[in-house]
């Protein structure tokens, strides 16, 4: 059974433009995969704690030596990772905040990137272990920054780092420029959704 994991990060939650685009993709995907499952994670409604020394040490402490608190931290991270492991398709809705991704997404990524779990170090460099998945990323921005912006590069690099290299990024830019620019950008993004699904 095919499974899609939808991750939204907008502070406006379901009303954010990136969330709306991700939801449209998920809905269209569900319509074309009636036997499939859609799981959702809202990082604003349920923010992941920021990585601190105690959490990092929990990840690197050998399993047999972990305290009860450390086991709880690792179990939480394992559950986040398992959602991705079970998914065939990841859909991310990501607005631009201060030229980067929302801090909630960065905190989430910090709990996903685990050596020996989602990636491993090799003599040739790091190797992602979550292979064979597709990611569709909707990035929304108030102005125009282009597809080669560092925000886009970061998202693509992180997904590749954990093994997800089949990545489609859809930008909707100029959303704060004016009504005409916003509708044009969102219309183009919706058209791209129909092509991708």
Where do the language-model regions lie?
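N-terminal beta1-alpha1-beta2 submodule of the flavodoxin-like/Rossmannoid cofactor-binding fold
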Residues: 1-94, 100-110, 114, 191-197
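Hydrophobic/aromatic beta-strand patches that form the interior of the parallel beta-sheet core
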Residues: 5, 39-41, 136-138, 168-170
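Cofactor-binding loop segments of dinucleotide-utilizing enzymes, especially the Rossmann-like FAD-
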Residues: 9, 140-142, 172
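Flexible, glycine-rich phosphate/dinucleotide-binding loops
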Residues: 13, 47, 144, 176-178
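Short glycine-rich anion-binding loops that position phosphate/pyrophosphate groups of nucleotides
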Residues: 96-99, 141-143
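Short, structured loop/turn "capping" segments at alpha-beta junctions
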Residues: 115, 119, 165-166
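Short, glycine-/small-residue-rich phosphate/pyrophosphate-handling segment
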Residues: 121-164
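Glycine-rich phosphate/pyrophosphate-binding loop and the adjoining helix
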Residues: 146-197
